[in-house]
Amino acid sequence: MLNTAREIIDVCNERGIKIYDLVLEEEIKNSHTTEEEIRKKLDAVIDVMHASATKNLTQSDVTEYKMIDGFAKRTYEYANSGKSIVGDFLAKAMAMAFSTSEVNASMGKIVAAPTAGSSGIMPAMLVAATEKYNFDRTTIQNGFLTSIGIGQVITKYATFAGAEGGCQAECGSASAMAAAALVEMLGGTVEQALHAASITIINVLGLVCDPIAGLVQYPCTFRNASGVINAFISADLALAGVESLVPFDEVVIAMGEVGNSMIEALRETGLGGLAGSKTGQKIRRDFLKEGD
């Protein structure tokens, strides 16, 4: 397992390799398989991501509680209208994040990368960026492998679980993984990939997990949409030469410490934050009544 970001940088620079090379070597060793087989499995995962990110752009899944239905379709239509403030590329990326969130909420097939609650971020980044830059499959696979390396460092120091570390741990981690993957796919350095991951987490440090009625829908879907934007802007900054003063290892340690300091009501219990609002509590009561 890749232990620290510092170790990753040192080994990659010493050997003249990239993060995805290290991840591949480790997977081949641990799973006793071949690179060809690993890349074949990655293709299957990427296909599921593409399907979830695009499914609801022109239709709407119907979820049981209808809290987020139609967000993807509306945002996609707006992105194509030429009126978007942030431009059609970022607006479409948000629509793609919404799409996967809707698929998840309607019990469809998604890839938890790294969690179901943050499952819209990586697919939206991969699909939107591929449409823009026309990445080939190997480049996409290498980006995905890079994200795995970032995730391994996060799990060493912190957690992916909102119930342990808040939404910073879920969407923050997903965004960091996506940002590093994008830097790799665009030809950035190992250091730039890690700076992008650091900046991404810094942007959401302290973000709480407060799902209304305990359902992974609202406000989760907005945090997936903003999460993919976070990944894009953080990758942009890193590729521009902007560096994180605090190295990635320390950023993740800080995220873990912040998560540990959060009160229980703000860690996926459905009690605090928006879940504790009057509207949130009413929805929760209605939800519990339906379950009786």
UniProtKB/Swiss-Prot annotation:
Keywords: 4Fe-4S, Gluconeogenesis, Iron, Iron-sulfur, Lyase, Metal-binding
Enzymatic class: lyase
EC code(s) of this entry: 4.3.1.17
Superkingdom, taxonomy of origin: Bacteria
Cofactor: [4Fe-4S] cluster
Listed NCBIfam families: sda_alpha (TIGR00718)
Subunit structure: Heterooctamer of four alpha chains and four beta chains.
Family in the record: Belongs to the iron-sulfur dependent L-serine dehydratase family.
Protein name: L-serine dehydratase, alpha chain
Gene from which this protein is expressed: sdhA
